[in-house]
Amino acid sequence: MGCGAGGSCTPRPPIRQQQAPETRVVAVVFLGLLLDLLAFTLLLPLLPGLLESHGRAHDPLYGSWQRGVDWFAAAIGMPAEKRYNSVLFGGLIGSVFSLLQFLSAPLTGALSDCLGRRPGMLLSLAGVATSYAVWAASKSFAAFLASRVIGGISKGNVSLCTAIVADLGSPSARSKGMAVIGVAFSLGFTLGPTLGAFLPSETVPWLALLFAVSDLLFIWCFLPETLPPEKRAPSVTLGFRAAADLLSPLALLRFSAVARGPDPPTGVRLGSLRGLGLVYFLYLFLFSGLEFTLSFLVHQRFRFSRVEQGKMFFFIGLTMATIQGAYARRIRPGREIAAVKQAILLLIPASLFVGWGHTLPILGLGLLLYSWAAAVVVPCLSSVVAGYGSPGQKGTVMGTLRSLGALARAVGPVVAASAYWLAGARVCYTVCAALFLLPFSILRTLSPPARTLKAE
């Protein structure tokens, strides 16, 4: 209550809780996601050796998986070489991990729309930490596979990071936040494998667990709630029922969970959202396939060792981080779609250079263009999609998008590996180059409404 000069007192307006500063939110999301990705990517350079050790131990579960891999390799005509076999085995495990993300991401997003981002994030990170604890505590293939299953189901924290950024008020903050998420991915996939390659294999699971627990404590202490109670979905049951629509790929592509929710985008905007989701799926389907077969190509054509492949992926990650820091995060709101179209067009010569080049300079030029596209497309598309839906739908919207990406990453490597070994590298990469015209053409039809996006 305040008193004026005449002695009269008037009640002051109630003090409202201030929304968390956007810069702080983005910084916490970046550091938390980086810790999570470092824990996840520590495993990558150890995976071939880990699988070989389970094979030498004559693990019965590993043997049954190996027979399935051998059957698939024979079906697509892949040479019976141990190195190729380990890449294919690891890729199939990665596809299972992505498939579990596809199933869990929309449910996590719907839960966060009702209960808030913090509870959903803490629950996901607790599951991730549990997965590393299972891996560290036991050395059997069954325990390793169980840790991957728990981790895949719990990996909704990544889609929640995008939902938290989508909660931010201004389009410029959302755009920069999505770019910062891209930087975290680039740094995580650059530093994590490098660190894992130099550590003793028995140390890596415990370090991954340390990173995961540190991430959980960091988020507990510093992440503010970005979805206030008055903007949340009214019922978690309704959210789960809507999210169940996303277990159907067709319903997923139609954003059915969003369309049936409260205050959904309608008309042209709903059509644009569906088009953007299709572009996201097609891009990651093609891109993840090229990414997976790249290990086959450089070993077959250039005889790259594991160390040389590590250097190659370090170059890709460092280039992506540089482009995201210097260019992608500076893209103005409304210009994201134009940047995505340019990046997708760059993938056409990139695919041809990689698929047809027989010299290291040509390969390097292709990888440079490939890295540019990888640095731009996902952050910009995520930023645009974040503008759709009411505040209480952001988790479902971004969970849907993440689920589309996980589905693409689950099937893309299998299809690309089949095409690579059945038709050859040149045909595989040429067909992929031509198919990149599909998402580009869809974006041309969506450009006008997409540029005028604003939070609903």
Curated annotation (Swiss-Prot):
GO terms for cellular component: brush border membrane; nuclear inner membrane. It comes from Bos taurus (Bovine). This is Major facilitator superfamily domain-containing protein 10. The chain crosses the membrane at residues 25-45, 87-107, 125-145, 149-169, 179-199, 204-224, 278-298, 311-328, 343-363, 365-385, 422-442. Probable organic anion transporter which may serve as a transporter for some non-steroidal anti-inflammatory drugs (NSAIDs) as well as other organic anions across the luminal membranes of renal proximal tubules at the final excretion step into the urine. GO terms for biological process: apoptotic process. It is a multi-pass membrane protein. It holds the Pfam family MFS_1. The keyword Membrane applies. GO terms for molecular function: transmembrane transporter activity. Keywords: Apoptosis, Cell membrane, Membrane, Nucleus, Transmembrane, Transmembrane helix, Transport. Belongs to the major facilitator superfamily. The lineage of its organism: Eukaryota, Metazoa, Chordata, Craniata, Vertebrata. It is found in: Nucleus inner membrane; Cell membrane.
